[in-house]
């Protein structure tokens, strides 16, 4: 984007040099790639008035001109331009002057006639041929308006200017316009931005009487509007407008087309102007193209369209390729009198695909691709109406013909001063922060310590709190952020943190139990994103995933661990024991960063012990997996409890939730037989723990106790109970009545079958008693044992 300083001053006034402005803009995030000075290498360039022109006596292609350059007498200049003529105001390089390329102007004789200066073309003063009006491509430049001879020609041409070239990143589409840049500059210098005039004197005639607009697919075209201007006069644009277009890299054509391009650069809103009489209908229908449909664009090329393309039609025939290029038969020509001005919002993806496929890149398509500001769509059309009325003698019809919805002009985001200060290291007051947002043109609402920032649609790069924090840092000044030393809760001298130590300890426990550590992808398929999830929350999906298998961020580590086990088993490695410590992700509200939680998961399948010498095998089972989990809890000095549960994807009768301090922190269970079969796995057991929750409870030290000086006692008890009663319920009853001498319990046998009623099972439990202060007696233990048995009988158990 090329930003003219002379043009920028129309919206914002600052007392600073262009070089300082460019430096400041670069420091705040928009790189100024180049600074173009149109006065560089130019000296003694003035406006001249050609008083007379005579043919050169000795050269057919040369003319001898008498030119008034504001001095006492006219000077004689020999000129070879085919379009030079008496009565013209022209650009003159005086004797002693300089032009780009090191050209020095001297007195000379051309075929015997003296020449005291040079009548210049735009190319000769450094303007690229690509941007010069076609009428001056092969001759000198002629002013379309009367000038004062002898005045500075660069000032008369509005080229006494410096232009900044922005190297924009895709997120800063707002700076693809003069107004967007003016907002940025106003914020940097804490000044006000003045918007241009948009109000026209309207006729009583309504555009609704001459035009209708219909959108067939609002997903691709959310909004389309049109205004009508009658009786325009096609002529060259004013010099100032032509100069601004040239400095922005656009060739001036005529006042109507130039106004369209001017407003595009001013607001960043692409417009299209149709010859109303050439449309051939009072209907404008916006639809997707028919497969194989053809149209000829403004570059005289016939295009074959696809259904993915969006076209503007007169109800039958395409008159424009939406957002990319107009059609040839409705273009503005010299005889055009009545204009229809289009202002619309088109789907960025559709515009990108169409422009890429047809190799049609334009100023309009590049802006539609990045997304445009809804707040400027109608305002830009109104601005074009005002300019057509002012510079093309147009008569503006009242009312706007539209279809669809513009959408929200603002996006509210809540933030606090504390959040900003903690993130950046500032100490700004709430008023300071609100002032910065107001400098940026963002309205704010304050409710206690919460600042609600109303972000305008032109700033599509601001969607979350962190974006607002960046804006505060940019405008306040990155260089002004105070240097501070990092603050730590606890400083360690080159040693592991408590969490690092405990994580390493857990890994050693699991590796010692025969499990291998795995590291899997954080991305899973959308179907697997919520599988085994302990929190039923919204998933985080990629907008453009590389494959369907990696389309969402995981909420569990198990889907990929199951894949890893299946992969190994398919390659004859049938005994698989893996664990992983990794992050899972849960979405928050729109504009909020997701929660990132560290989990610990494991999977075991096949044989746990293979003794080839004796031929004995121990197959992985629930209790083996539970033993691994219990070993983790012991190492972290935690106490888990288990509660029967039903979890999708796990065996309904062999699954339990893992509780810590009465809160669910994980689960353990056998993989559902159907899921196991789908992955060619035999009986497979998995567990998953919220590792962050464990770390939050686990203390960073181990409590040591003396070795008991007195012997303990063990009693076994066999209970016949209903098969649906979990052992955990029985153990809970035992511990509730065991007093302070019952140290632990162990289920060592479960039996169902012969000699038991149907629906019953026998559970054998060992109870270990110990008193650390004195030797236990049989009488004391028996008394406690009797209380326990009575409680179990009351629970429905039969003592065997």
From Swiss-Prot:
The keyword Manganese does not apply. NCBIfam families: pheT_bact, YtpR. Residues 408-483 form the B5 domain. Mg(2+) binds at residues 461, 467, 470-471. Gene3D superfamilies: 3.30.56.10, Bira Bifunctional Protein, Domain 2 (3.30.930.10), Ferrodoxin-fold anticodon-binding domain (3.30.70.380), Nucleic acid-binding proteins (2.40.50.140), Phenylalanyl-trna Synthetase, Chain B, domain 3 (3.50.40.10). GO terms for molecular function: ATP binding; catalytic activity, acting on a protein; magnesium ion binding; phenylalanine-tRNA ligase activity; transferase activity; tRNA binding. It comes from Staphylococcus aureus (strain COL). Tetramer of two alpha and two beta subunits. Residues 39-154 form the tRNA-binding domain. PANTHER family: PHENYLALANINE--TRNA LIGASE BETA SUBUNIT, PHENYLALANYL-TRNA SYNTHETASE BETA CHAIN AND LEUCINE-RICH REPEAT-CONTAINING PROTEIN 47. Binds 2 magnesium ions per tetramer. GO terms for biological process: phenylalanyl-tRNA aminoacylation. The keyword ATP-binding applies. It is an enzyme of class 6 (ligase). One of its GO terms (cellular component) is phenylalanine-tRNA ligase complex. This is Phenylalanine--tRNA ligase beta subunit. It is found in: Cytoplasm. Its EC number is 6.1.1.20. InterPro entries: aa-tRNA-synth_II/BPL/LPL, B3/B4_tRNA-bd, DNA-bd_dom_put_sf, Fdx_antiC-bd, Fdx_antiC-bd_sf, NA-bd_OB-fold, Phe-tRNA-ligase_IIc_bsu, Phe-tRNA-ligase_IIc_bsu_bact. It catalyses: tRNA(Phe) + L-phenylalanine + ATP = L-phenylalanyl-tRNA(Phe) + AMP + diphosphate + H(+).
